[in-house]
Amino acid sequence: DATRVAFVFCVGYGAVVAVDRFTGKRIWQTQFDKAAGKGFSLSGFLDRSDPSFVSGGVGIGEGLALLGTTRGDVVALSVADGTQMWRSNVGTEIGSVPTADNGRVFAQSIDGKLTALDSQTGEELWTYNSQVPRLTLRGTSSPVVANDVVYTGFASGKVTALRAENGEPIWEQRVMLPEGRSELERIVDVDSTPLIAGGALFAVAYQGRAVGMSLRDGRPRWEKDTSSFLNMAEGYGQIYIVDEEDTIVAIDQNSGEVVWQQEAFARRKL
């Protein structure tokens, strides 16, 4: 019964476990890939070159547990029993958690490509390509879907809204413009998942700023200098950002004003 599944997570190369939401007991475990003879040693676990390495985390939607690998595979497992439903290759490493909505699965790879797949068959429906700078952070933004529109961030420092049906761009908004003379100084990845709350969309860039913008056209409502590559959270009319110094910052959703900051976790790698 898929409704009893509380968590689905990867415990190694190709090994996935589902846990009962009421008892915490294991419901099922499956091995969709084998780790090239490495077993589960620490050295093997850290070897991202292994094709079975799950690089994109686990996403849940459309009755599926969705995983992305360093090989560029999107793997769909049944949430109910762990059966592999399909597997599709998008070309390069999946850098974030795949997302599913309304019969489609969306996955972003580290080459700046967003791919839409049929949730029942894994067949490719469309792709959208963004320009990737020479030097970027490892990982990518996970797509988020609302009202048949896909929103995602890219290493270019931009957030893009696309029609979920065909990948047609609706709008594009720059969160941060690259600045500085060196490639390191010019890294402005939007690696955190765009956050939708209170009828607005929020995004944050590394070495850049946080922006609250209109869902309809991407027009900025406010901007606040900060730097982060971690996912945001929201609640009580605020968004919460963990910046690159591990300071937790609460920002008012409407005004963009900082409500409070908590520096007690500095340099603790939140």
Regions found by a protein language model. Give the residues of each.
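C-terminal soluble interaction/assembly domains
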Residues: I241, T247-Q253, V259-L270
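Beta-propeller domains
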Residues: G12, V16-G24, T30-F32
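Hydrophobic beta-strand positions that form the internal "hydrophobic ladder"
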Residues: A6-F7, A65, V105, V150, ...
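Structural signature of WD-repeat beta-propellers
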Residues: V11-G12, T69-T70, S109-I110, F154-A155, ...
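Beta-strand-rich domains and repeat architectures in extracellular enzymes and scaffolds
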Residues: D1-G12
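Short loop/turn segments that connect beta-strands within beta-propeller blades
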Residues: D20-T23, S78-D81, D118-G122, R163-G167, ...
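Extracytoplasmic beta-rich repeat domains
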Residues: D1, Q29-G59, Q84-D101, E124-N147, ...
